[in-house]
Every structure is written in structure tokens, then in C-alpha cells.
Amino acid sequence: MSNAHAQAGLATLDSSMAERLPSVSQTLFSAKAATGITFEDMAKELGRSEVAVAGMFYGQVQASAEDVVKLSQLLQVSQESLAPLMAFPNRGHAGPMPPVEPLIYRLYEVVQNYGYAFKAVMNEKFGDGIMSAIAFNTKVEKEVDEAGNPWVVITLKGKWLPFTRF
């Protein structure tokens, strides 16, 4: 894929977020823009999900030493500059609450509107408990309907953790 072609659909760092993210995030996003590589391409090379790889860029997902080696090669940056990715993430601080970015706000709105419905259905199916966001994976897929309209499919898969009686 040419760098010019890749730039049109390439996720980049919103400069207003930069100060809230780890310093390595700027290195990652700059290298991503320079190489024109997508999260999908990186995920295939790392054997991880696109969301996990993107999460590394935002300081929300910990990278393994193997991830750092592969990212270093893919993004053409030193392994040393990516070493902070192996530290424990400081999760949950990337943006304001409630979110102000429109797409992220829509996800927040889904939980506001359907959160209790999700909870009720899960309780009926599994009992009293919660869905783990630790023993968890997620993916984003694109579907196109019969009329040619694009649809987003977000899968959230978490281990069910029943509350214990005490």
C-alpha cells in the first residue's frame, strides 16, 4: 500500500489528547503516519487484535517484549524508544467523562441507553455477576447490507464472573 493511499484512511493522534497520553504515544503515531501502516496490518504481524494494538498506542494495553520487537521493525523506530510499552498501563485516563469526541460519545450513549437492558439480560442468562473487562477480548468488523450501507459490528467478549456469597 502506498503511503499516500494509506494516509486517507489512517488513524492519527488527535493533538488535543497528546498531553493525556504517555510520551511513547506520540512516537508511535508519528511512526505510524510516516510508514502508512494500519492497525489491521500491525495486528496481523503481532498476532493480536486491532483493538489491542490501537490500545497500545493510547497507553491502555501492555505490550510484550515480542510485540516491541515487531512494532520496532514495522514502524522503523528503535526498540528502546518503545520499551515504555512494556510497563504497566495506567488505564482509564485517556479522555474526559462524559466523552466529547462524537464517536466515543455514541459508544457511551449505547451504554447509557442500553446498559440496564444488557445487565438484565445477562443476569437472566448467567445469574448475579459481571462481565470481565480483564478476561476479555473485542473486535470491530465492517458489514455491508443489501442496500450497500456500511454497518459497524462491535463484539465484546468477557468472562462471566459471578458474585460470591459471603
UniProtKB/Swiss-Prot annotation:
Q: Which Gene3D superfamilies match?
A: Cyanate lyase, C-terminal domain (3.30.1160.10), lambda repressor-like DNA-binding domains (1.10.260.40)
User: Could you state a single Gene Ontology molecular function term?
Assistant: DNA binding
The active site of this protein is located at 106, 109, 132
GO biological processes: cyanate metabolic process
Query: Entry's InterPro entries?
Result: Cro/C1-type_HTH, Cyanase, Cyanate_lyase_C, Cyanate_lyase_C_sf, Lambda_DNA-bd_dom_sf
Q: What SMART domains does the annotation carry?
A: Cyanate_lyase (SM01116)
**Keyword vocabulary terms for this entry:** Lyase
Q: Name one Pfam family in it.
A: Cyanate_lyase
Out of the domains of life, which is the source? Eukaryota
Q: Which reaction does it catalyse?
A: cyanate + hydrogencarbonate + 3 H(+) = NH4(+) + 2 CO2
EC number assigned by the record: 4.2.1.104
Give the protein's function. Answer: Catalyzes the reaction of cyanate with bicarbonate to produce ammonia and carbon dioxide.
UniProt lists the family membership as follows: Belongs to the cyanase family.
**HAMAP family assigned:** Cyanate_hydrat
Its protein name is Cyanate hydratase
Gene from which the chain derives: CYN1
